[in-house]
Amino acid sequence: MILCFSGTGNSRYIAKKIAAELEDEIVDVNAKIKAADYSPVKTGENVIVVTPTYAWRIPRIVSDWLSKTKLLSAKRIWFVMNCGSEIGNASKYNSSLAERKHLCYMGTSQILMPENYIAMFNAPQLEEAKEIV
């Protein structure tokens, strides 16, 4: 099961690639959060959380949703985070979240995507963005 939260589409793009490779399904965490839906999610044993990096960790709104939502049958959890340059110490926070949910933390992976936090950084030109992706 892939749990995806996407603000600009980068995470959704990554989640779709992972889902195709693993022949797994994606749950749209954005929709769940907007609906205040904290009902249990039937995940199977393996859960992959795909999110952008906000302030060098997963978005607080996502960690709050994960904390409140029961992941049925889940045993192992991975985190895949996209970023413009780095995810900082996100793995520490992700490991702690996994522990609180009584899940085996399998790791955090970062995927570089075109920078899109334009309040602080310049977005890359089209050719550079294509090279990154």
Where is each model-derived feature located?
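FMN-binding flavodoxin-like domain, especially the glycine-rich phosphate-binding loop
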Residues: 1-2, 6-33, 37-51, 55-133
